[in-house]
From Swiss-Prot:
Protein name: Large ribosomal subunit protein uL6
PROSITE patterns recorded: RIBOSOMAL_L6_1
Keyword set, alphabetical order: Ribonucleoprotein, Ribosomal protein, RNA-binding, rRNA-binding
Lineage, broadest ranks: Bacteria, Bacillati, Actinomycetota, Actinomycetes, Micrococcales
Domain of life: Bacteria
Length: 178
């Protein structure tokens, strides 16, 4: 048995989980998410818990067992509490501002960079150097934050660029002068 997959998922008050064929729909106070289930995996809801099972012990079924359980648990947490990622902008002249739903970033290029939010993800700005990416889908929030970070990764000599708030940038020593 998968150690992760065999654990039941508690359904909190205010969250509803429905299984329709190969689709699991999870609805909560912040919204609803849908998850397609693989053929080898079975999902059942009984007395306030979600149980994930598998049909056989093949390698793919074992892998999908734990994955499916983790995805359902993430969706249950997302529709109840939501997910946020915080990014910081470090560097002279580097700043961010919000134009409607979009972000406008000044990253040292000759032009501003605009970032459109993906569906289900919203952007927030604190000051002119902090970006807050939030939403109910953990994967969408992580991908949106990673795509913003990718625009200007933190460089190791001065540390300027876009970084996660909890990220530690390894610094290198510059070349020694004479």
């Amino acid at each position: 048995m998968s150690r992760v997959g065999k654990l039941p998922i508690e359904i909190p008050v205010g969250v509803e989980v429905c299984v329709n064929g190969r689709t699991v729909s999870i609805t909560g106070p912040k919204g609803s998410l849908y998850l397609d289930i693989a053929e080898q995996i079975g999902v059942s809801v009984s007395d306030g818990k979600v149980l994930v099972s598998r049909s056989d012990d093949s390698r793919t079924a074992r892998a999908l067992h734990g994955l499916t359980r983790a995805l359902i648990a993430n969706n249950v947490h997302g529709v109840l509490h939501g997910y946020t990622k915080t990014l910081e902008i470090v560097g002279t002249g580097y700043r961010v501002s919000k134009k409607g739903e979009n972000l406008e970033l000044a990253l040292g290029f000759s032009h501003p960079v605009f970032v459109d939010p993906v569906p289900g993800v919203s952007f927030g700005v604190e000051g002119n150097s902090k970006i807050i990416v939030s939403g109910i889908d953990k994967q969408a929030v992580g991908e949106a934050a990673a795509s913003i970070r990718k625009l200007s990764k933190p460089e190791p000599y001065k540390g300027k660029g876009i970084r996660y708030s909890d990220e530690i940038v390894r610094r290198k020593v510059g070349k020694a002068g004479k």
